[in-house]
């Protein structure tokens, strides 16, 4: 793990921070840490009694407004966090800390109900039966144009069975193909270095390939305009470690030689929960 000293979207060096909590499931999954109760019989002179949680820091970039966790996890830690992601063992472990997760997870595994909205957004950007690569697409259940794409390839480390009509590909196989559409949906909010991911994705794109990028438009960003108030409101961190602004997304895309051709923020429902997402159509710049 590293502690971020610069913005992970625009590389700005002016960051403002506030103390926060790393949620118990994430702390346990990553480091084996659990909350502990400090009792009177500990005899701690300078430490108050109560439950001690895992501490971290919320950071905000003064330039692009990205709100993010200071902890940047390495590949081994990320593998531990997402091992068996949404599978039985993962769900059981998370249910222990977050009662009710298993029921919501079952809804998430069934797929989202707003795929038609995304396909409509992409209709003018890709052919009617596009060749699609879903980068980080898990089983492919949420891939736009699923069931009518000319090709439905999935590049993902999860190893979960894929939906009918899709195939899992490795990096070499994907790089040997030509795609009309590359999808990266609800991925980069989880990763330590989103610019690196977007640069990697750009390698799979040709000059006429469209990228569909989707990330949460988190309520704390969407509903709180004043930066200081927004930072103060972000007191805990879970699996989403990057809360994006439009400016942060533009900066991250630019670092990969990509530019947004269209961007909308709109309401969605997934896993029985209402939220907002940024939907972005991007292409290689120039």
Protein language model regions, located:
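Flexible internal linker/loop segments at domain or repeat junctions
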Residues: 221-229
């Amino acid at each position: 793990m590293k502690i971020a000293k610069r913005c992970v979207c625009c590389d700005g060096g002016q960051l403002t921070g506030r103390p926060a909590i790393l949620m118990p499931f994430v702390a346990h999954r990553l480091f084996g840490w659990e909350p502990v109760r400090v009792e009177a019989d500990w005899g701690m002179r300078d430490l108050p009694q109560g439950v001690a949680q895992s501490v971290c820091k919320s950071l905000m970039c003064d330039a692009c407004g990205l709100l993010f966790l200071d902890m940047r996890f390495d590949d081994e830690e990320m593998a531990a966090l997402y091992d068996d992601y949404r599978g039985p063992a993962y769900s059981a472990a998370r249910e222990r800390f977050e009662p009710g997760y298993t029921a919501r997870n079952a809804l998430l595994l069934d797929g989202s109900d707003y795929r038609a909205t995304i396909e409509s957004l992409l209709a003018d950007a890709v052919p009617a039966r596009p060749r699609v690569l879903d980068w980080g697409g898990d089983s492919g259940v949420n891939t736009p144009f699923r069931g009518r794409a000319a090709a439905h390839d999935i590049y993902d480390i999860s190893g979960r069975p894929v939906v009918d009509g899709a195939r899992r590909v490795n990096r070499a196989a994907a790089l040997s193909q030509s795609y009309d559409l590359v999808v990266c949906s609800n991925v980069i909010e989880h990763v330590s270095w989103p610019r690196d991911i977007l640069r990697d994705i750009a390698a799979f794109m040709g000059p006429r390939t469209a990228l569909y990028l989707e990330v949460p438009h988190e309520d704390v960003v969407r509903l709180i305009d004043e930066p200081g108030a927004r930072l103060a409101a972000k007191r805990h961190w879970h699996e989403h470690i990057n809360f994006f602004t439009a400016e942060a997304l533009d900066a991250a895309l630019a670092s990969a030689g990509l530019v947004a051709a269209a961007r909308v923020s709109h309401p969605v429902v997934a896993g029985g929960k209402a939220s907002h997402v940024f939907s972005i159509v991007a292409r290689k710049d120039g």
